[in-house]
Each structure stands twice: as structure tokens, then as C-alpha cells.
């Protein structure tokens, strides 16, 4: 298992708790660094020496939304070098937003939050397994 922290950008504390419970059930023991907004996450990403394993981000967040957050990361030369996998996981899946995520930035996935724990667990399991196997510039 890649050991970098999993970054979760999610304003809903209940969703954060479910996400952490799922990772525990999946025996994924990477630390989870949780941010309620994109400004805090962006500040952390610019200053940390950690190489995060993956970023899970909601789209609908107060302040800078998830799309704008990803655009900010893409526009930062140092963060682009880190090649951190970035996945949207959101209840918002309108086609316009999905299209924008894939055509105007470098997003690695866009997933709808599932309605049940079991379905969401399966989605997160697939995402984590994929990125565990995937090679990218900062694979260690």
C-alpha cells in the first residue's frame, strides 16, 4: 500500500465519518487529512512535504468549489509536479460539471456518491485499488 496521506476535501462531517469508516473496513490505514474547504486544502498542499496518495474532493463546497480548487492545483507548477491523483466524489453529477472536469483540467475520476454504505464502499475500494496499482511520476 502506498503510504501517503489521503486528502479528503468535504464540508459534510457525516460524509467524512462514513468515508473514514469505509477506509477502516477496507483496511486502508493511510492517514486521512480532512479539509472542510478548498482554501485550507490548497494551503496544506502547497506547504506539506508529504506526497499524498490521492485527493478525494466534493464538488459542492462553500467558498471555492471543487472545480475551482482543482483548477488552482493545476495552475500551480509545484503541485503539478507532485502528480497527486485527484478524484471527484460528489452528489452533483450534472453533465455540464462532469464535462468541465474532464475537458478543462486534469481530473483522474468523477464519481457519484452512492446512496448506501455498501455501494459507496465498493466505489472507494475500486478507486483505491486502481491508484495502488497505477504508476505515475511520483510513484515511490
Regions flagged by a language model, labelled:
Residues 2, 28-29, 50-54, 79-85:
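His-Asp phosphorelay/catalytic-motif detector in bacterial-type signaling
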Residues 3-14, 19-23:
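Conserved acidic segment of CheY-like receiver
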Residues 37, 65-71:
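Acidic catalytic/metal-coordinating carboxylates
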Residues 57-62:
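Active-site residues of response regulator receiver
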Residues 68, 93-111, 115, 122:
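Alpha4 helix (beta4-alpha4-beta5 surface) of REC/receiver domains from two-component response regulators
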Residues 89-90:
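Hydrophobic/aromatic residues positioned on beta-strands within the core alpha/beta folds
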Amino acid at each position: 500500500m502506498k503510504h501517503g496521506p489521503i486528502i479528503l476535501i468535504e464540508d459534510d462531517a457525516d460524509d467524512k465519518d462514513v468515508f473514514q469508516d469505509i477506509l477502516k473496513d477496507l483496511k486502508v490505514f493511510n492517514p486521512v487529512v480532512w479539509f472542510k474547504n478548498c482554501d485550507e486544502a490548497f494551503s496544506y498542499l502547497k506547504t506539506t512535504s508529504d506526497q499524498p496518495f490521492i485527493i478525494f474532493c466534493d464538488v459542492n463546497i462553500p467558498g471555492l468549489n471543487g472545480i475551482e480548487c482543482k483548477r488552482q492545483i493545476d495552475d500551480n507548477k509545484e503541485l503539478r509536479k507532485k502528480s497527486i491523483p485527484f478524484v471527484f466524489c460528489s452528489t452533483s453529477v450534472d453533465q455540464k460539471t462532469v464535462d468541465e472536469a474532464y475537458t478543462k483540467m486534469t481530473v483522474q475520476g468523477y464519481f457519484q456518491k452512492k446512496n448506501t454504505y455498501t455501494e459507496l464502499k465498493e466505489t472507494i475500494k475500486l478507486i483505491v485499488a486502481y491508484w495502488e496499482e497505477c504508476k505515475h511520476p511520483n510513484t515511490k
